[in-house]
Amino acid sequence: MNELRRLTITEMHDGLRRRNFSAVELVETHINAVENEQLNAFITKTPEIAIKAAKIADEHFLKQKDDIPPLMGIPVGVKDLFCTKGIKTTACSKMLENFIPTYESTVSNLLLKSGAAVLGKLNMDEFAMGSANTNSYFGPVENVWIRKSDGAKVVPGGSSGGSAASVAGFLCAGALGSDTGGSVRQPAAYCGVVGIKPTYGRCSRFGMIAFASSLDQAGVITRSVSDSALMLEIICGYDEKDSTSSKRTVPKFSSFINGDIKGKRIGIPKEYKMDGISDEIVHNWEKVSSNLKENGAEVVDITLPHTKYAIPVYYLICSAETSSNLARYDGVRYGFRVDADTLEEMYSLTRAEGFGKEVKRRILIGSYALSSGHYNEYYEKAQCIRALIRNDFIKAFEKIDYILVPSAPTEAFGLNEKPDPLIMCINDVFTVPASLAGLPAISVPVGLSNAGLPLALQVIGNYYDEAGILNMASVIEQNCGRIVNSLT
């Protein structure tokens, strides 16, 4: 492999600034890798856009070496949930197979304005619904990691599986993803990379195809914590086009990564020590907790009593919002259409053929939960319990600074294994609570399992404390070391 692809964003930027290599060289190396990739991570490739950005970057680096945006000339990918003007945006669904937006999402536009070289659009679970990236209309994504015990291919996680696999496979230096119930953090954990979901409202949702509007949030996946800080600085900020975006000033997150965690109180919730979590993850959880103590932090036990209700609450709320958000796909205004004799028949056939199995399952659940006879019993009750979950976190953060939990209960499972939907739901058990509360959280690799697959922990912070969780994650990263796949 060309060594340029193994560099982090920080190292790439430094090399460009020193003129050790050109942006065109850097981007062309990645374009070649994307053209020959075997992971099915990229579904739309935009080499001409990437090369154009690289040429502009080289002109800037020739004129000046300082005060150049950290992503200028850096090869990145964009999850196919974000609308990209003039470039096919499908949400990996047959329903939007040929949809070409006439506008750019705010977060992808911020990447373009920063000078990043966008290599293309990344595979994902259809409409971001899934935890394995096996629900894509364009086929599953493969994880770059292989299970040593039997040589089996494993899933990359989801729904941002293409984003995580492309970064882990050195196809791009960083990737834009989305996180509704763990869709950045869980695939980052499975692929051995860093994934951060900021506070709900930190990033604009304008131009991001809606799944569950009260939960959806853009996030980033990179190979190091410092790289995540750099990307997050670019995509965060107020947007008048999104009424839920925050007007809070966005700090320079990278400047807060100093490794100083002395006196910080880290909570370990007893409710997360549940059945089904692997012994290897428990071991790493305990080891990292001890390491953080050695670095001056205080580790204490806490309780989040309503966590046990998080999964059913999440699936009721997100399915209800899915039912509402996806009602617009009827074959009339845009997207896939089945010709029929009557309007009602066209609606029915279009949605039956245009949506995949998992999407239809969630629409049915959501429609049932919102129906007049069940609204109070299911949806309204779920919202009440969501408030209790949020209040548990608020109360906990009165006495602690951060929460340390696993990112997933197990390592990645086999690509050809078919766990039932209930198992897939439980897979999100550690990421969903922070999403329901709207809190920032970051997944960071902590080692490998006996089968040679990545394991990860998650740091959850208080509202708008992305800087704090990035610094805490950097200490974990320093203690555990970054993991790199030798097969790539």
Swiss-Prot record:
Gene Ontology cellular-component terms listed: glutamyl-tRNA(Gln) amidotransferase complex
Catalytic residues (UniProt): 79 (charge relay system), 159 (charge relay system), 183 (acyl-ester intermediate)
Catalytic reactions on record: L-glutamyl-tRNA(Gln) + L-glutamine + ATP + H2O = L-glutaminyl-tRNA(Gln) + L-glutamate + ADP + phosphate + H(+)
Sample GO molecular function, one term: glutaminyl-tRNA synthase (glutamine-hydrolyzing) activity
InterPro entries named among the record's database cross-references: Amidase, Amidase_CS, Amidase_dom, AS_sf, GatA
Taxonomic superkingdom: Bacteria
Keyword Cytoplasm part of the UniProt annotation: no
An annotated GO BP: translation
EC number: 6.3.5.7
Keywords per UniProt: ATP-binding, Ligase, Nucleotide-binding, Protein biosynthesis
Record function comment: Allows the formation of correctly charged Gln-tRNA(Gln) through the transamidation of misacylated Glu-tRNA(Gln) in organisms which lack glutaminyl-tRNA synthetase. The reaction takes place in the presence of glutamine and ATP through an activated gamma-phospho-Glu-tRNA(Gln).
Protein family (similarity comment): Belongs to the amidase family. GatA subfamily.
Subunit-level organization: Heterotrimer of A, B and C subunits.
Annotated protein name in UniProt: Glutamyl-tRNA(Gln) amidotransferase subunit A
Organism (species): Wolbachia pipientis subsp. Culex pipiens (strain wPip)
Upper lineage: Bacteria, Pseudomonadati, Pseudomonadota, Alphaproteobacteria, Rickettsiales
